[in-house]
UniProtKB/Swiss-Prot annotation:
Subcellular location: Cytoplasm
E.C. code: 2.1.1.-
Family to which the UniProt record says this protein belongs: Belongs to the methyltransferase superfamily. RNA methyltransferase RsmG family.
Entries under PANTHER family matching the protein: S-ADENOSYL-L-METHIONINE-DEPENDENT METHYLTRANSFERASES SUPERFAMILY PROTEIN
Keywords for the protein's UniProt record, in alphabetical order: Cytoplasm, Methyltransferase, rRNA processing, S-adenosyl-L-methionine, Transferase
Phenotype on disruption: Confers low-level streptomycin resistance. Seems to be an important cause of resistance in resistant M.tuberculosis isolates.
Function: Specifically methylates the N7 position of guanine in position 518 of 16S rRNA.
Identification of the protein by name: Ribosomal RNA small subunit methyltransferase G
Binding locations of S-adenosyl-L-methionine: 69, 74, 119-120, 137
Length: 224
């Protein structure tokens, strides 16, 4: 038995088979279509699927969750598999990625919504605003990410950004901009300590005030 299997069984439960099929899609068509690097195949479970799924510890039952810059479906798809009670929206601007997501979601039969667009676009904010949480992984620095996330979530909603070992440094660097963008209770937390070594590192923040219309669109650069 692989060291990953007990953790995967605990996290995905009876839907582990769906997680396996998703991993196969990432390792096959995902690599062939340039959505996953070939060197990532050997660590899909610990570094990608499980690392993403465990942030469900920070979500409430029935939450509407927007995955910003979903790419190949991370972290949104592992969350949707592990937590079928969640209402997961995969937000991704690139056509080739949304095509992959639609094919994969249809094959898996998981209940997720796919939206092709960017977080800073007004129509996206109109459609997805008021969500309970915005999640992301490897999308952008925290200053931009906060400006993109806050307009999509309700007051007191959560921003959950999966980060690496520099998470504390990044929070120190961007805290002022994050607060100016409406974030409160900004902190670094870990998830999955019972299953992963090391556990997933997440920058957690809440939306603490009303966001000025268009604040996200003033962020320089484009979103993934």
């Amino acid at each position: 038995m692989s060291p990953i299997e007990p953790a995967a069984s605990a996290i995905f439960g009876p839907r582990l088979g769906l997680a396996r099929r998703y991993a196969e899609a990432l390792a096959g068509p995902g690599v062939e279509r340039g959505l996953v690097g070939p060197r990532e195949v050997g660590r899909l479970w610990d570094r990608h699927l499980l690392n993403c799924a465990v942030i469900g510890e920070l979500l409430e039952r029935g939450d509407r969750v927007v995955d910003i810059g979903s790419g190949a479906g991370l972290p949104g798809v592992p969350l949707a598999i592990a937590r079928p009670d969640l209402q997961v929206v995969l937000l991704e601007p690139l056509l080739r990625r949304t095509e992959f997501l639609r094919e994969m979601v249809t094959d898996l039969g998981v209940a997720v919504e796919i939206v092709r667009g960017r977080a800073e676009e007004s129509w996206v904010q109109d459609q997805l605003g008021g969500s309970d949480a915005a999640v992301s992984r490897a999308v952008a620095a925290l200053d931009k990410l906060t400006k993109w996330s806050m307009p999509l979530i309700r007051p007191n909603g959560r921003m959950l950004a999966i980060k690496g070992e520099r998470a504390h440094d990044e929070v120190r660097e961007h805290r002022r901009v994050m607060i100016a963008s409406g974030a409160v209770d900004v902190r670094v937390v870990t998830c999955g300590a019972n299953y992963l070594r090391p556990p997933a590192t997440v920058v957690f923040a809440r939306r603490g005030k009303q966001i000025a219309r268009g604040s996200a669109r003033m962020a320089s650069g484009g979103t993934a």
